[in-house]
């Protein structure tokens, strides 16, 4: 439904503009509207957008519940796109709860499934989630490879909303290396 999409997208815009409380309020409105309309695709869209917003707010508990609900809904209705994204977000939440290996594997599985749907919108952001988990587990080389892929993909597709964050992550990983090159990390 167009209203659910507009509210969901607006929640992200508000977050990026620096209005976290308004973003959450609008996201809740999108979820309520989707539930009231009882349209599976609208519900899946609202749940996914809410998951991303809650990830930005670092609310893994919400995502653990919501990602499972989204995965079940997506499976029931054949929404492969949302099934893949539920895996990514659920993997991030699992990693935040301390299950880093399972979280990384689940994010990777979700990213592969997402790629297989033929879409790539948002992929730089999702790759950033994987890189963060890799960095937390000391897999710095893999984190840097994933971050380079995310940055290149964002530039190639002109999807640059997350580029500054990806660059920040790159610097952080470079500084965490045992033989850190501070000059390279600052670039």
Explain the meaning of each model-derived region.
Residues 1-2:
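Short, flexible, glycine-rich and Lys/Arg-enriched loop motifs at helix boundaries
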Residues 7, 11-187:
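Helix-coil-helix junctions within alpha-helical repeat/solenoid scaffolds
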